[in-house]
Curated annotation (Swiss-Prot):
Keywords: Cytoplasm, Schiff base, Thiamine biosynthesis, Transferase. This is Thiazole synthase. One of its GO terms (biological process) is thiamine diphosphate biosynthetic process. CDD domains: ThiG. It catalyses: [ThiS sulfur-carrier protein]-C-terminal-Gly-aminoethanethioate + 2-iminoacetate + 1-deoxy-D-xylulose 5-phosphate = [ThiS sulfur-carrier protein]-C-terminal Gly-Gly + 2-[(2R,5Z)-2-carboxy-4-methylthiazol-5(2H)-ylidene]ethyl phosphate + 2 H2O + H(+). Catalyzes the rearrangement of 1-deoxy-D-xylulose 5-phosphate (DXP) to produce the thiazole phosphate moiety of thiamine. Sulfur is provided by the thiocarboxylate moiety of the carrier protein ThiS. In vitro, sulfur can be provided by H(2)S. The active site is at K96. InterPro entries: Aldolase_TIM, Thiazole_synthase_ThiG, ThiG. It comes from Bacillus pumilus (strain SAFR-032). Gene3D superfamilies: Aldolase class I. Pfam families: ThiG. Belongs to the ThiG family.
Length: 255
């Protein structure tokens, strides 16, 4: 089970809702993924305009927890304003804090992310900050009281996978709150690897929505995350420099 801010979830896959080729494909991908948490950019949603279609109208919202994000914010103040807008819509009190510090790499601004997280915690939000793989920053965010840490595997939408698994493993090892690998996952292999490291969950968007067959990829990611988690719980064998025979040596005939 995945526990975030007093809420409990069965699925360890969080799914983004942007850039799908159609509402129909999006809805089917969400269904087969069996994700329970769906994230979306508040700035791209007409949450107060009933005449404008959006993906929320396509879903049975009783089955999902919505995770608005502050994509588009470049300062803490902007992120807080976006979060307040999402909360005012009545959708959810959870917020993914996303404050971008570089428009080219889309890497997060560490200082503004810390500030935004602190401000939103004071306002009673369930705060999930998107951050880099900086181990010290992750610790400082946890010390603030965030409800989960979301380090990026690599730049958003890059599909480069886990560029620094060592740092991610350090973050996972030290954290007392859930660690959700977010950004840069490109394939089921990446998702499984993140879970094998001990991550509590993986958040995906482009890897599914940008695939040739988003629905099939959503299913593949679901299975990869489940198998990666099982592998982590089972415990892999230690790495060795030399081979070790798997067959017993006792009872072998002498020639």
């Amino acid at each position: 089970m995945l526990h975030i801010g007093g809420k409990t979830f069965t699925s360890r896959l969080l799914l983004g809702t942007g850039k799908y080729p159609s509402f129909e494909v999006q809805k089917e991908a969400v269904n087969v993924s069996e994700a329970e948490i769906l994230t979306f950019a508040v700035r791209r949603m007409n949450i107060f305009e009933a005449s404008q279609p959006n993906f929320l109208e396509q879903l049975d919202l009783s089955k999902y927890t919505l995770l608005p994000n502050t994509a588009g914010a470049s300062t803490a103040d902007e992120a807080v304003r976006i979060a307040r807008l999402a909360k005012a819509s009545g959708l959810c009190d959870m917020i993914k804090v996303e404050v971008i510090g570089c428009s080219r790499s889309l890497l997060p601004d560490p200082v503004e992310t810390l500030k935004a997280s602190e401000m939103l915690l004071e306002e009673g939000f369930i705060v999930l900050p998107y951050t880099s793989d900086d181990v010290v920053l992750a610790r400082k965010l946890e010390e603030l009281g965030v409800h989960a840490i979301m380090p990026g595997a690599s730049p958003i939408g890059s599909g480069q996978g886990l560029l620094n698994p060592l740092n991610l493993s350090f973050i996972i090892e030290q954290a007392k709150v859930p660690v959700i690998i977010d950004a840069g996952v490109g394939s089921p292999k990446d998702a499984a690897y993140a879970m094998e490291l001990g991550a509590d969950a993986v958040l995906l968007n482009t890897a599914v929505s940008g695939a040739k067959d988003p629905v099939k990829m959503a299913k593949a990611m679901k299975l990869a995350i489940e198998s990666g988690r099982l592998g982590f719980e089972a415990g892999r064998i230690p790495l060795k420099n030399y081979g070790t025979a798997s067959s017993p040596q006792e009872g072998m005939p002498a020639f």
